[in-house]
Every structure is written in C-alpha cells, then in structure tokens.
C-alpha cells in the first residue's frame, strides 16, 4: 500500500510540475483563461493583467459560469502554487482537460511575461 501511495504521489507530482517545467516563457492560446484562485484580499495586493479572480473555495460552484467549455485552456496561479495545484486536480475531476499550473503569482508573471497590476 505504501509503495502504491509513493508511486501515485510521484505521478501526481510529475504531472503537476510537468505542466510548467519549461523554466522559460509560456505562450497562452488566444482562447485561454487565466485564473487567479487566491482570496479577494490577496488579489487586491497584485494580480496578473487579464486574470479572472475565482477563489479556490468558490471554484467548483462557479467555474462553469467563467469557463463553459471544458476543453478551454486554463492557466492557474495562486500565492505559492499549492492552491493552483489543488485547483488543477478539482477541475480535472470535473472534466476540464487543458489545465496548466503556473505556481505562485511571481512564477506565473515570469512564465507568461504579463505585468502585475494593483
């Protein structure tokens, strides 16, 4: 059982980190949605231009009103990368297919080369 958990943990870690493991710039598709899953208070301190605020606590109940097509590319960030990873897993379970965990705000800003606004 422990071996199975270790293997599954490794696969999940590789899948999540593999979304953005290029270390360089990422180019979002034109129809992509940039999703900020932080709290409104965190969002007020700075956010990526064009990002849609959808706190993780509201993700499952409100995502369909923000992204109706489950094949739409969704790029997700938070403060540190933990909540964005959780968001990716929740959205996968809901049938969304094209998901990208950008990690924290500064990581996302560097990867996408999008300015941080306040």
Place the predicted regions along the sequence by residue.
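Rhodanese-like catalytic fold shared by cysteine-dependent sulfurtransferases
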Residues: 2-8, 19-32, 40-72, 82-118
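Bacterial Sec-type N-terminal signal peptides, specifically the leucine/valine-rich hydrophobic h-region
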Residues: 13-17
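Active-site flanking residues adjacent to catalytic metal/cofactor-binding acidic residues
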Residues: 35
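Short, surface-exposed ligand- or partner-binding patches at beta-edge/loop junctions that are enriched
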Residues: 77
């Amino acid at each position: 059982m422990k071996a199975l958990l270790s293997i599954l943990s490794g696969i999940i870690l590789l899948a999540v980190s593999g979304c953005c493991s290029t270390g360089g710039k990422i180019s979002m598709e034109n129809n992509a949605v940039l999703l900020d899953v932080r709290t409104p208070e965190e969002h007020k301190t700075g956010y990526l231009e064009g990002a849609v605020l959808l706190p993780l606590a509201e993700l499952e109940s409100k995502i369909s009103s923000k992204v109706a097509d489950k094949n739409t590319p969704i790029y997700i960030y938070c403060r540190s990368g933990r909540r964005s990873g959780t968001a990716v897993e929740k959205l996968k379970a809901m049938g969304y297919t094209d998901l990208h965990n950008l990690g924290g705000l500064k990581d996302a800003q560097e990867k996408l080369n999008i300015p941080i606004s306040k």
